């Protein structure tokens, strides 16, 4: 992996790296009222207890380079599964539902790891129901609560571009959502970058994880640990601002910016048959 002034090069693609040198300018751009996308992570509202405690050991940093190499060679990171299964980069548009869209993207990636290809979940419904149709922010644990209550339908039942409650009482939507309503989550320690990296790097059971970032006021999900330079690591993340964001919807957060106020590992999802 090489680093240039444009960011980190991965598989021939330049991924934007967000660190202390550019974060303030970066946030300023996306705080512009003319920007078609919103954030919506409310760190002041975060509560714990929506998942089990993190059950794994913290992997020593000296082992990270070998594990990064292991996942690259075996194409076994959550990101490899995400790409192979065609998991979509989601579009929250101007709704402050990043907390649900990031959670939904991580769910979709966990299904990819379970061998389900072509699945396209739509996070809008549980967010809309949970917030009573209001366009307001939230947090990852709240997303988990609403998904376990109502599920999350596929886009085939609730099209991606339907950003209203018109389909809430549709029977097909209800059936589709209930296929994806039992999510097992582990809560990682707040602001613990090593726990986040250990979750994603686990050699046997790597998991995608939501990243609620207080400095950004936004929630994304992490899919891969990368080495930005010798001894310096970051997290490749997937945003919910369409593929027009970053490189194919993704970017890299340096450690100082990937240290998340709320971190939820998606450990398992409800079993289902393959998508036809």
Model-identified regions with their sequence ranges:
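A generic signature of intrinsically disordered, low-complexity regions enriched in glycine/proline
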Residues: 23-24, 29, 35-39, 83-88, ...
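Substrate-binding/charge-relay-adjacent region of secreted/lumenal peptidase catalytic domains
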Residues: 59-149
